[in-house]
Amino acid sequence: MDITNANSVVSLMNSVLAPSSKVGSLDGSAGDNAKVSIDFGAVLKSSLDKVDASQQKAETLSRSFELGNNDVDLHDVMLSLQKANIDLQTAVQVRNKLVSAYQNIMSMSI
C-alpha cells in the first residue's frame, strides 16, 4: 500500500467522521464522571504510521544486508520483511472492511 493511498483513506475517514465529531467522547460508568475520548482518525493514522515504520525498517535492513553489512543477519532481514508484510496485509483488510461498512451505510435508505 502506497503512503499516498493510506493518506487518501485517512482523509476519507476524516471527512466521514467530521459531521459526527460530537460522538467522539463516551461517558464511562466506572469512575466519578470519567470520560474517555476516542479519536478514530488519530488511531487510524497512528496505525498507518506504524505500518509505514515497519516497512521502512524492513527496507533499511534489506538494503544493509544487500550492501554486505556484517551487523545484519539474513534471518533478521527475513523476519522484518515478514512482519512488514503482515502489518500491510492487516492494514489492507481493515481498509477493505471500512470501505465495505461505508458503502453499506451509504446504501441505506433514510
From Swiss-Prot:
InterPro entries reported in the protein's UniProt record: FliE (IPR001624)
GO biological process terms, semicolon-separated: bacterial-type flagellum-dependent cell motility
Keywords annotated in UniProt: Bacterial flagellum, Plasmid
Cellular component aspect of the GO annotation: bacterial-type flagellum basal body
Principal place of residence: other
Record keyword Repeat present: no
Signal peptide: none
Recorded superkingdom: Bacteria
Subcellular location: Bacterial flagellum basal body
GO molecular function list: cytoskeletal motor activity; structural molecule activity
Family: Belongs to the FliE family.
Protein name: Flagellar hook-basal body complex protein FliE
Species: Ralstonia nicotianae (strain ATCC BAA-1114 / GMI1000) (Ralstonia solanacearum)
